[in-house]
UniProtKB/Swiss-Prot annotation:
Belongs to the ClpX chaperone family. HslU subfamily. The gene is hslU. SUPFAM superfamilies: P-loop containing nucleoside triphosphate hydrolases. It comes from the Bacteria. CDD domains: RecA-like_HslU. GO terms for cellular component: HslUV protease complex. It holds the Pfam family ClpB_D2-small. This is ATP-dependent protease ATPase subunit HslU. GO terms for molecular function: ATP binding; ATP hydrolysis activity; peptidase activity; proteasome-activating activity. Its main location: cytoplasm. ATP binds at I19, G61, V62, G63, K64, T65, E66, D277, E341, R413.
Amino acid sequence: MHLHFTPRQIVEKLDQYIIGQKDAKKAVAVALRNRYRRSKLAENLRDEIAPKNILMIGPTGVGKTEVARRMAKLVGAPFIKVEATKFTEVGYVGRDVESMVRDLVETSVRIVKEEMVVKVQDKAEEQANQRLVEILVPSPEKQSGFKNPLEMLFGGAQNSNQTTDSQEDVEIEKKRQDVERKLAAGLLEDEIVSIEVTEQQSSMFDMLQGTGMEQMGMNFQDALGSFMPKKTKKRKLSVKEARKVLTNEEAQRLIDMDEVTQEAVYRAEQLGIIFIDEIDKIAGKQSNSVDVSREGVQRDILPIVEGSNVATKYGSVKTDYILFVAAGAFHMSKPSDLIPELQGRFPIRVELTKLSTDDFVKILIEPDNALIKQYIALLATEGIEIEFSDEAIRKIAEIAYQVNQDTDNIGARRLHTIMEKLLEDLSFEASEITLEKITITPQYVEEKLATIAKNKDVSQFIL
């Protein structure tokens, strides 16, 4: 957990990946810092302070989801994104709203489990290597065949075989030590070994996906799994692959799942972030049955956001201190079209601005994961060094902005489409090109994109 970041530091970290949207960054930075402040309070006062949920308003592709996702990643908090339109009112077929909390807990369990695996990794690998030694050079007990019960009872012939057995033990021990050295030195990585692994059984409840009954299926499967023996199967793998499989198995054995569950539920309750996208799609006046159904979903979401207990397979989870970030474009509706009770649960309102040509230029080159950097790295694997002139980058940004204006405005996502079309021929022929360095000029951009961008009928299908 990295809750010690100040709001300014959080904004600076977000600036490395997201261009603009200062208001949204400040809002989430303050929300995160308040969690740190709350953790320092006395318990009686801490219980009274709930997070201030955030409503982000802005068109698609301007960074609403990315701000929330990067914020969660920055502090290592459990984070999930759900779409409000996927939920149905209680009593109808579809996902119930409580599933978002169950998904959050599952994410939290996965995060904690991965952290625990890292802690026991060295010990797990050591035990996996011991199992590999046992497979390559079985111990005398496993090599020995059937023993006569009378011989075991009366000890007849034991003395006569004792010397031979002792010599065999010494020889086998030498072999085991030799194999251990070779394994440590990586000299046996390509050797093929036969190992027994736990078989991954396909779930008979996959058919329940999307029906709202997944939790019932999972609980039933867990109940069955607790008393049904796990199946194993033999697999032939190289030592390198076998070590990975065995290390994973040993790590799972070393982890205390009760400890994982306890920590995961705590993190989900105290640090969890749920991003509810497309909340504008369930807003509307009660003019028809569809809007009434949408209001039903809002009323189902309300107790989750207000604070309630949700039953999960890991136990009851309180939602009182989970941070909810809702987002929507609100083209066809307004935030005031949400039911008043739900509006009141999102006191912080942030409006994200549309992206300009200058924003597109910055998005292409400034973030740590900028698109230009990605394409340069991809083509470098083919031995080709490409560079973009400043004028070419400006031209790409102008075309992306213009296509957004002429067709549907999908924000920064338009740049992905533009860049793919621009470098389509180069990517296709990269393995055959003999040139080591290629410069992308405004003329090249014009040649590849201008004709398509100017033709609205074509651009809406291609770009």
